[in-house]
């Protein structure tokens, strides 16, 4: 059954404002990132690689994530590594590859299906895109969680979306 939701002009305007602000954070982050020391990307992934990654992970990437994977593929700069995707990597190395990391941790530790590893804080704590918690424009929030005897536990939500998270990291690095 198809359900239609009617929005008032002000509701639609609010959603559009959220979309614009959300996307502006992403664009600003990616414009500033090359100014960071040791800025590195891998040049982007093909649509086939992105589609295969989505199928393996069981999620549809958000607009910001899809654009990031298409244009950059991966991002690192001094002390920071934003994971990329490589659905065909069979090296056994999971670090830096959201697909391999998620599939490994789902199998070994019961990682939730809607959590996609994004960033390793190197202290047993990871940042995840939480596809079970989307904002008004379909972007997943970024959560920090760790694994303990009980399983994964969310520590906090650290960003409204992918763009805000990257922008925070980039601004921190540029301030140093």
Q: For the regions a protein language model found, what residue spans apply to each?
A:
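Glycine-rich, aromatic-bearing surface loops/beta-hairpins
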Residues: 162-165
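Short, amphipathic alpha-helical segments
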Residues: 109-112, 156-160
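A surface-exposed partner-binding patch
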Residues: 2-125, 173-176
């Amino acid at each position: 059954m198809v359900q239609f939701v009617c929005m008032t002009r002000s509701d639609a305007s609010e959603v559009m404002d959220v979309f614009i602000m959300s996307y502006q954070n992403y664009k600003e982050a990616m414009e500033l990132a090359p100014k960071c020391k040791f800025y590195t990307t891998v040049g982007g992934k093909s649509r086939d690689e992105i589609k295969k990654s989505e199928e393996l992970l069981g999620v549809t990437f958000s607009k910001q994530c899809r654009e990031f994977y298409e244009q950059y593929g991966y991002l690192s700069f001094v002390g920071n590594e934003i994971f990329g995707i490589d659905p065909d990597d069979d090296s056994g190395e999971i670090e830096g590859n959201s697909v391999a990391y998620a599939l490994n941790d789902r199998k070994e530790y019961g990682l939730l299906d809607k959590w996609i590893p994004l960033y390793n804080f190197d202290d047993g704590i990871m940042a995840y895109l939480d596809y079970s918690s989307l904002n008004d424009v379909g972007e997943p929030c970024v959560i920090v969680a760790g694994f303990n005897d009980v399983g994964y536990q969310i520590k906090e939500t650290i960003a409204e979306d992918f763009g805000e998270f990257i922008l925070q990291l980039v601004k921190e690095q540029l301030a140093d």
